[in-house]
Amino acid sequence: MEIDKFVKEEDIPFEYGVVRERDNAVSWSRYLATKRSAGDELNLDWLYERCLKEIKDDWHLWKEFLKWRIELLNDCDIFRHKDEYNKISLLFEQCLTSCGKVGDAWIMYMEWVIQFKDLKRIRELLGKALRSMSWEYHEAIWRVVIDFIINELLIDNKRYELSLEDSIYYFVHGEHSTNFDTDLWSSSILQRYSLICDDIEPLLIYIFKTHDWSTIVRVFEKHLSPNLKPSQTSLFELYVSYITSMILVDNSAGVAAVVDQCIELFPFKKGELKTYLIFNLIRQGKITEAELYLEKVISETKDIIEFSVLYDFWIRMEELLTQELIQKMKDDNSEKQRLFANIRLHADTLTSLIKNHTIRLNDLELRREPNNIKLWLERVKLFDTISDKAKVYADAVLTVDYRLQTTPGLLGELWCQYCRLFEEDIEKSEVLLDKATNVPFKFLVDLENVWLYWCEYRLKRSIDDAIKVLSVVLEIPDNHELLLQKFEKGESPAQAAIFSSKRLWAMYLDLLEVKGNYGTAVNAYETAILIKAATPAMFINYALLNESSGHQAEALAVFERSVEIFPPSVSKSIWDIYLDVALKADITKEQKRDIFESAIKLAASGVACVSFFEKYSDFELNLGFHERSVEILHKGAKNISDLESKCTLWEECINRSEKQLDVNHTRKLYEECIETLPNSKAIKFLLPFAILEESRNEVARCRALLDYGSKLLKPAQNEELWDFWRNFETMHGTKDSFKNMLKARRFLEDTMKVNTEEVSRHADSIEFRASTAKISGSGPPSAEDKGYSNTAEIDLGL
């Protein structure tokens, strides 16, 4: 008997137990544990089968038995031990007969079956399991199957992308791409799973890898929406997958609808999205429609990114079409003539696209900014022939809205360039100029540019023609002040104020002077002054015209009027010329002095009019009034506010005093200069002053000046003074004074670590005090003076 074969003497107690209570799982478990520890696999298998015949619905025993049987087959070849694998499958079937409601049993069976990769069996088992299991176990068994699909069936499948190269190849050769493996089994399982799936994103990603386009379209149509918030990919990529699938199932209407939806969702991607419409047309063999669509979109878009994407796509499409057609013609001569015509057509299109890229880009920019004149002027440069350029100019002047211009002069320049194009055609050029002068320009400079160009154009033929043009436009209307007010308020165009154009008046007056009619020129100048169109340059020219014509008094009168009209900062340039003319004029010395006195009043307004004081001083010097000459420079040094100009005049004043006046006068000037100038500027005058005192043998005063000057700058920055002082002490000093000089330098080198300019601003800083000593004349000093100057008179203020 079989029982005698497996039951040993030590098993008898267990046998009594299981015989008495056949349905007692505990007794069976103890018995099985004993057998398991014995290591007899046949005996254990026999005992498990006996046990499960008695207790058929105990899942824990079944699970224990099945796990043990499966472990026995670990590392065994599934094909060489196929019978053993089938036995386990039968055991699972027996288990499910009794434990069909146990979810874990179905899951364990599915994991076992998946090892065989028998897709039919997996699908059938999945169906049985879902029908038998309770609802809460459905997701678990689905997870097993889905993981199998992802990790085994779709592991090598890449995300399919439409290729322009493939699309053109199949278009030329008349067939559709089949360059992908369709996994119908996986797509059907995934589609079924989508009905209960909570996380739809990974399912959409993986079902797209099955390449079952019809199923993919159905699943995407049902589950993809703008509300989806993917984490593994982007919503845009999911929509691209959807569009790609519809293209591959030839659903043109669906493609167009979804692309339109995506353009609203992803406006920054509309260029790329529209390429899928072109892919769809190419797949349908409608290459001409694809080209027309590209032409339409590129000609209408205002989006630079969309333009770039589609333009590059079109160029690549034409390149591939040309290449594939050439290759087909090489392979098949039967349609050589038709293919050659197509090659020529696409090659011409490609050439045109490459050649006209800059022009088309300019088209786009002008669609975005039609009133941008700089773009129109750039566009003109893109064409070579006069007719093409003329068309651009014509389009520009018709398109540009003068009311929206913000840059003065550009619109006028556009019209001038337009007219310049037809300079050789006098009649046409004059017609264009007439039109240009009637444009209601917003800015005066635009209309000025047109009239100036017209004048210069006429001047090439005749000066009289040029004068005639300007005399018309500069005719003063009766209500000219009212017209100017309206223009300034923006109520009238530039034509209302053109008569007051300073640029036109300048040109007109220059032409009249060249013409040589003095009376006409004077009347024109007076008219310009009357309407306040005269500039400083016009006044100067008017005065010089009078001077050159022998009307000296009138010239000076014009100068006098002009300096009264313009503010000091502007009138300085007029005074420069006025003074030169006045000096040469046949008028009295007093009149010239009056003119100079008026000129130097500009100093009170903060104008650095150094040259006026210099000219005035030279004037008095030439007359022999030496002291007055110095006084004028002295006055300028005191009155001019600009520090550099002040220093210049002090230097000239002192130099002239040394040459023309006595030493007492010069000393007073030095003292006032040093006292009034900031220390940083005063130091420039200290050394010459010290040299002067040394020359007068004023040793103590010279030493005090050097001591004062040494404290204004760091010794390293004041070497010239220290060198002089060293030589001075060598020649005039004593041993003690020389030591004191060295001590002073060492002290200053150690302590002077701050900016002396800042120190000089404080109340306790170095202060210069002028001497009150009476010096006799300019002769040599007396013995009483030698070495006995009152040194207390120079207070160092330390």
Swiss-Prot record:
Transmembrane segments: none annotated. It holds the Pfam family HAT_Syf1_CNRKL1_N. SMART domains: HAT. The keyword Chloroplast does not apply. It is found in: Nucleus. Keywords: mRNA processing, mRNA splicing, Nucleus, Repeat, Spliceosome. Associated with the spliceosome. Belongs to the crooked-neck family. Involved in pre-mRNA splicing and cell cycle progression. This is Pre-mRNA-splicing factor SYF1. It comes from Kluyveromyces lactis (strain ATCC 8585 / CBS 2359 / DSM 70799 / NBRC 1267 / NRRL Y-1140 / WM37).
